[in-house]
C-alpha cells in the first residue's frame, strides 16, 4: 500500500490520468489477493485443481499475465480463445479463465483508487461519530415513518444495461482514457452477457470470478440514476414549497422556474407534477429499492409509470413493469438488511362515557415489526455447507483440520454475531433454531475430526462444551436505541434493542444476497 501511495504522490494533480500503468504492476494483484483473504469466512478459497496452490497468490501466473499484456494483441487472442473453448475443457481455456479473473480483480483495485482517495479524511476535518454509520440506526427511522404510510413500491432495479453505458457512467468519475479503453476491451471481448450475468437472481451478478469488478460498475450505475432521481425530487419539492405569494420580488420566483426548466431534460418538464407528495421515502438495499408514499393509489401508480419511462429514456433499456409491484402496507412485508419488516394493525376498542351515556370507539393502530427470516437464514447456512436445504445440520469438512478451540471459536463467533445483529427482532425465539443447527454442526465437525460419533464426543468432553451457543451475546459497550413494544403475539412483551456499533451487514444475510 505504501508503494501505491508513493506512486500516486508523484503527481497529485494528475492522479486519475496515470491509472493505466498500474495494470502492469505486480503489487496491484497482491492487493487484490489480500482483499480476497479478508472476505467473509463463509467463502472457501478457490484453488487450481491439480496444482495445489491458490491461483491468486501465484506470482508466476501474475508475471506471466503481465508479460502477455505487454505483448501486442496477446490479451485479445487469449480472450477469443477462451470464448471459443469455454465448453471444451482445454488447458488454454483454463488459463484464459485465470487471466480474465486476475485482470478483473486487478482492474477493480485500480478503479477503486479515485473513490478511496475521496474517503481519506484530512487532518483539518472534524472526526465524525462512527455511531452515525450504524445499520441499526435506519430501523428506528423506518419504524417512525412506515406506520404512517399507505402504499409501497417494491422495485427490482432493472438489468441488463448496455456495456457502453457502464463505461460512459464510469467516465464521469475517471478521466483516464487508456483505462477506460482497456475496460471497454475487456467487457466487449466477454460480450456474451448471459455468461457474465445470472438472470435468475433477484439482482444481476457477475460470475464469482468477476464479482468485485461488477460491484464497482453496478454501484456507479446506481449512483448515476439516483443522482438524477434525487435531484428531481428535491428541486420539484422546493419549487412547490415556496409559493409565489411568499416572495416580495415575484421576478425571482419566475427566474427560478426558468432555471429549473433549463437544467431538466425535455421529458423531465412533463413529469415534475408527479412529485406532489411530501411524505415520499426512498430506500435502496443492493439490487432492490423501496418507494413508500402516504398518497393515494393513483399517485403511486403514476410513480410506477414514471420509473419505467425514466430508465427507458435515460439509460436506453426497457424496464419491465412487472418488476415494480404496488403493495398496501397493511398486508405487505419486505426483506430488508437481514430482517423481514412489516406493519402490524392492532384493532382496539376504547370505552368513553359522557354523562350517563356509554359508547365504544373502535381504533386501529399500526406498529412496525421486524422479525428474523428463518427460512432465508437456513438457505444461507445450506449454501455455506453448515446444513442441508431442509435444515439438517452437517459437518464442515474444511474446518475439520483446525484445532478444537478454533472450531468452537468460529461457530461461537457466528452465533454471537447473529444474536448481536438480530437484537432488534420482535421474535427472538426464531434464532434458537439457527443456533441449534450451528451447535450440532460444530459437534459433527469435531466428531469428524476425531473420527467419532457426536454422542461419544459429548460424553468424553462433557455436554457443557457447547453451552456458549445458547448464552447471550457478549456485552458490548455501545449506545443503543432500546424500544419496548407490546405486541399481542402470545401476550408477552418483546424488547428490541438497536445497537449503534454495527457498520456492516451480518455475513449470513450478506452471503445470501450476493451468492
Curated annotation (Swiss-Prot):
The keyword rRNA-binding is annotated on this UniProt entry: no
Any one GO biological process: RNA splicing
Gene Ontology terms: cellular component: chloroplast
Major subcellular location class: plastid
Keyword Phosphoprotein (UniProt): no
Residue spans crossing the bilayer: none
Location of this chain's protein in the cell: Plastid, Chloroplast
GO MF annotation: an example: RNA binding
Keywords: Chloroplast, mRNA processing, Plastid, RNA-binding, tRNA processing
Coiled coil: none
Annotated Pfam families: Intron_maturas2, MatK_N
Function field: Usually encoded in the trnK tRNA gene intron. Probably assists in splicing its own and other chloroplast group II introns.
Stated family: Belongs to the intron maturase 2 family. MatK subfamily.
Protein name: Maturase K
Species of origin: Trillium luteum (Yellow wakerobin)
Amino acid at each position: 500500500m505504501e508503494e501505491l501511495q508513493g506512486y500516486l504522490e508523484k503527481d497529485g494533480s494528475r492522479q486519475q490520468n496515470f491509472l493505466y500503468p498500474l495494470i502492469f504492476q505486480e503489487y496491484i494483484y497482491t492487493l487484490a489477493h489480500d482483499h480476497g483473504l479478508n472476505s467473509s469466512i463463509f467463502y472457501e478459497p478457490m484453488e487450481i485443481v491439480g496444482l495445489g496452490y491458490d491461483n491468486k497468490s501465484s506470482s508466476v501466473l501474475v508475471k506471466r499475465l503481465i508479460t502477455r499484456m505487454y505483448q501486442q494483441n496477446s490479451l485479445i487472442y487469449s480472450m477469443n480463445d477462451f470464448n471459443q473453448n469455454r465448453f471444451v475443457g482445454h488447458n488454454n481455456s483454463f488459463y484464459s479463465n485465470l487471466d480474465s479473473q486476475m485482470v478483473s480483480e486487478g482492474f477493480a483495485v485500480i478503479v477503486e483508487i479515485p473513490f478511496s482517495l475521496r474517503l481519506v479524511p484530512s487532518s483539518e476535518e472534524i472526526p465524525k461519530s462512527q455511531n452515525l454509520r450504524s445499520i441499526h440506526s435506519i430501523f428506528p427511522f423506518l419504524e417512525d415513518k412506515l406506520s404512517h404510510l399507505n402504499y409501497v413500491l417494491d422495485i427490482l432495479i432493472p438489468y441488463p444495461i448496455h456495456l457502453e453505458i457502464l463505461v460512459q457512467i464510469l467516465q464521469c468519475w475517471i478521466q483516464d482514457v487508456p483505462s477506460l479503453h482497456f475496460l471497454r476491451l475487456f467487457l466487449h471481448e466477454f460480450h456474451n452477457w448471459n455468461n457474465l450475468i445470472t438472470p435468475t437472481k433477484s439482482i444481476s451478478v457477475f460470475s464469482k470470478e468477476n464479482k468485485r469488478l461488477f460491484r464497482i460498475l453496478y454501484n456507479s450505475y446506481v449512483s448515476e440514476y439516483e443522482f438524477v432521481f434525487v435531484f428531481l425530487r428535491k428541486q420539484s419539492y422546493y419549487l412547490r414549497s415556496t409559493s409565489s405569494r411568499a416572495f416580495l420580488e415575484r421576478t425571482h420566483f419566475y427566474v427560478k422556474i426558468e432555471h429549473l426548466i433549463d437544467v431538466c431534460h425535455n421529458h423531465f418538464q412533463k413529469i415534475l407534477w408527479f412529485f406532489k407528495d411530501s411524505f415520499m421515502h426512498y430506500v435502496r438495499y443492493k439490487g432492490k429499492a423501496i418507494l413508500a408514499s402516504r398518497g393515494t393509489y393513483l399517485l403511486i401508480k403514476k410513480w410506477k409509470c414514471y420509473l419505467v419511462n425514466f430508465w427507458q429514456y435515460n439509460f436506453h433499456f426497457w424496464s419491465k413493469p412487472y418488476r415494480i409491484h404496488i403493495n398496501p402496507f397493511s398486508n405487505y412485508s419486505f426483506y430488508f438488511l437481514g430482517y423481514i419488516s412489516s406493519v402490524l394493525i392492532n384493532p382496539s376498542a376504547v370505552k368513553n362515557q359522557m354523562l350517563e351515556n356509554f359508547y365504544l370507539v373502535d381504533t386501529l393502530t399500526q406498529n412496525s415489526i421486524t422479525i428474523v427470516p428463518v427460512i432465508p437464514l437456513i438457505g444461507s447456512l445450506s449454501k455455506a455447507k453448515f446444513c442441508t436445504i431442509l435444515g439438517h445440520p452437517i459437518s464442515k469438512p474444511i474446518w475439520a483440520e483446525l484445532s478444537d478451540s478454533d472450531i468452537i471459536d468460529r461457530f461461537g463467533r457466528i452465533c454471537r454475531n447473529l444474536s448481536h445483529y438480530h437484537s432488534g427482532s420482535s421474535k427472538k425465539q426464531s434464532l434458537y433454531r439457527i443456533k441449534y443447527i450451528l451447535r450440532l454442526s460444530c459437534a459433527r465437525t469435531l466428531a469428524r475430526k476425531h473420527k467419532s460419533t457426536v454422542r461419544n464426543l459429548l460424553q468424553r468432553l462433557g455436554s457443557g462444551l457447547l453451552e456458549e451457543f445458547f448464552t447471550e451475546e457478549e456485552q458490548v459497550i455501545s449506545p443503543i436505541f432500546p424500544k419496548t413494544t407490546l405486541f399481542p403475539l402470545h401476550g408477552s412483551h418483546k424488547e428490541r434493542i438497536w445497537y449503534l456499533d454495527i457498520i456492516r451487514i451480518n455475513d449470513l444475510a450478506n452471503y445470501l444476497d450476493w451468492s
